[in-house]
């Protein structure tokens, strides 16, 4: 199962990464000042991604 991981980066900001079932990192977030803000970012991705359009840039 894919999973979101929350971690503290070297600059002291909270970030999340999305890992695929095979362990590959497929997305990394911006830095957040708080763990709570980071978790809200994850919730936003989970709520909005099902409706996201796919755009191929050429």
UniProtKB/Swiss-Prot annotation:
InterPro entries: DUF1508, UPF0339_domain, YegP-like_sf. It comes from Methanosarcina acetivorans (strain ATCC 35395 / DSM 2834 / JCM 12185 / C2A). It holds the Pfam family DUF1508. Belongs to the UPF0339 family. This is UPF0339 protein MA_3316.
């Amino acid at each position: 199962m894919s999973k979101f991981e929350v971690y503290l980066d070297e600059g002291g900001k909270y970030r999340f990464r999305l890992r695929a079932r095979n362990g590959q990192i497929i997305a990394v977030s911006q830095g957040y000042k708080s763990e709570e803000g980071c978790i809200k970012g994850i919730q936003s991705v989970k709520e909005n991604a099902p409706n996201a359009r796919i755009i191929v840039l050429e």
